[in-house]
Amino acid sequence: MNLLIAAVLLSCGILVSTGHTDKEIGTTDIEYVHLIFMNHLDVGYALPSSLGYLGNVLNRYFTEYFPRAVKVTFDLLVLGYQERFIYTTHPWLVSLYLDCPPNMVLPSGIKLQCPDAESKTDFINAIKLGFITWHAGPMNMEFEMMDESMNEFGIQLSLDLDKRFGIDRKYRTVSQRDVPGTTQAIIPILKKMGISALSIGVNGATCPAAVPPVFLWKNGNQSLITLYHPRGYPNQYGPAPMKPGGLSKNDCAIVPGLNHALCFAFRSDNDGPPVDYKEVLTVYEIVRAQFPNARINASKFEDFIALVIPHQSSLPVFSQEMGDVWIQGAGSDPLKTALLRAQYRVRSKCIKSKKCSLDDPRVYNASRFMLKLAEHTWGSNGGILDNIHWTNDQFYKMLTVPNSGYQNASKYWDEQRYMTNLAIEALGNHSMVEDLKQEFLNIMPNVPDLTDFHQVDISSSQNCGGFDLKFNTQGALVKLIDLKGQNWAGADNPLGQFVYRTYNQTDFDEFFNTTTPFSKDFFLGIGKPNMTKNSKAESTVWDTKVTALFASKGIDVVLQWFGKVPTRLPEGMHFVFKPVEKSGYKWWMKKFEVFK
């Protein structure tokens, strides 16, 4: 029996003292500043001044942002400025841009606009000159949504780009923005793929983990240098030296004993690179005001990490789980999550059996689309600003309003889920397609065939393989006696209990204030204002009842729900396991094929 447990942790971590004796470095002691030019990527969600459909976002990068980055780079050179511009972007975007599917059309009706030959050549020349670069991760991922094989492919994407352009990149660094953390279990996988460091910039409204700005994150005997920026990616830089915004000295990574600092010239969600060379010059002036004694240079992650490596033994050590409060997105589209997991299962099995190889362009391209499923963008609110229409009847009426925020939001979610279809299309005639289709069929609810079943009395005890077991009227095991006579279940310790839970605004006020303490910008989406006032929202667990119990051979768990009505009100569906605690036994959680 496979049990998925999604753990959401926000660590108040324990740091281990290293006995470091080097003197603390102040900003006046910094002699060199490494400047990383980036902008935040949401593959979907939002765009400045237009609807953020996935297709619109990709087209904006392909037709405007990438050409603009190239132009800004060469304008500085041609005009004779000493300042340089290096644009750090994402391997998934670069790969899709260079090997662009020419006929890709999304459910919104938006067609992907591939670059023409001239734009592509200019982009490649900028790469070869070192002015366009990328970090080591595919994009802003939620790693725990993927299996080990998919995580490895995400890193492989950047390795393949490096190989394509003859780039010998040491001290490779994964960048993750918006998402406030990830699982400790990712460390061995990243180390296996040659990653030296992880850089995390937390959404400004979200509660960050209790970790220092630069530390060594350990999992057993493996570790990553980790740069952690709370309350922003950082935020976008300001307009002038007196207003630095996210380019203040407090936003930069500074390591005791090292006279180099790392600062981010960050632009916000899908804002692209600086609009022109003048904006780049302003960025340099802002940083010079923050570090008056330093040389400022556009840089890359690995250049700074190479300098931190000799100091890593003196960094604070964090050896606990961090977790990711944004993993709540996994429950926002249960069908997409089920399809995602099905695709990853089939792909992993196919690769392990040697029936699939990344040398096959079909498998490689399909894997590239599969990566998008675990990117941190699950959908969008479509611009809905509605704290009135909470009841189901009101909600259904709003769904019928043409071109409304509700209809836009539905299209956003459909578009994100559609990436599963693109993966299948990319596979063409590969044998994996039939396996995927069968997995997808298994996901879809169907009234079970009871041919090999026989009905049993719900109140009676059953025996299966020497185990004595009994179900309660809610369908949960309340007795499970093993071959040694130990009972693992009881009335207060049910196994496999389906729980349906609804919530009211009080629940969400507490949730919002805990996870999103620094801003009210997301209050409508996360806080559910006026939900209880304008509906009959209840905070309660609802009773379930078994109507019939049937027995068959073997052990399998398939939970299906028929006739479920759509609702705007928040609800939770849980499959609960609460075994009897026994001395000498403990829970193990499986993460990336490893039990912890």
Segments predicted by a language model, with ranges:
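Short, flexible coil/linker elements and helix-boundary hinge sites characteristic
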Residues: G13, P292, K354, G428-N429, ...
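Cleavable N-terminal signal peptides of Sec/SRP-targeted secreted and luminal proteins
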Residues: N2-T18
